[in-house]
Amino acid sequence: MSMTDLLGAEDIKKAVEAFTAVDSFDYKKFFQMVGLKKKSPDDIKKVFHILDKDKSGFIEEDELGFILKGFYPDARDLSVKETKMLMAAGDKDGDGKIDVDEFFSLVAKS
């Protein structure tokens, strides 16, 4: 399964292009632009599993740095600052990784 099976390819491209500048990433706007917030819990869970590259059941900080590439392969990596800000927003229990429930909360806040 790929991201374009769940979200519109054109929406993804526009969202990625909106955040090409370093330190411009805003997860709330990005999730809105790709239409993630409007998706069913099942589809949001599928997106989580696509982003969980090592299939550990968590999105760790190193995977988070590549989150845009999970949506669009030619996208840039997040900066260290952007990655840390996204982790701080998503990691509610402070274990240094985002589980599926924390990801749901992150999407719901967008």
UniProtKB/Swiss-Prot annotation:
Keywords recorded for this protein, A-Z: Acetylation, Calcium, Metal-binding, Muscle protein, Phosphoprotein, Repeat
Domain EF-hand intervals: 39-74, 78-110
Positions contributing to Ca(2+) 2 binding: D91, D93, D95, K97, E102
Parts of the chain that traverse the membrane: none
PROSITE patterns: EF_HAND_1 (PS00018), EF_HAND_2 (PS50222)
Residues recorded with modification N-acetylserine: S2
Disulfide bonds: none
Keyword Disulfide bond: no
CDD domains the UniProt entry points to: EFh_parvalbumin_alpha (cd16254)
Annotated residues for binding of Ca(2+) 1: D52, D54, S56, F58, E60, E63
Residues carrying Phosphoserine: S2, S24
InterPro entries: EF-hand-dom_pair, EF_Hand_1_Ca_BS, EF_hand_dom, Parvalbumin
One annotated GO molecular function: calcium ion binding
Name of this chain's protein: Parvalbumin alpha
Lineage: Eukaryota, Metazoa, Chordata, Craniata, Vertebrata
UniProt gene name: PVALB
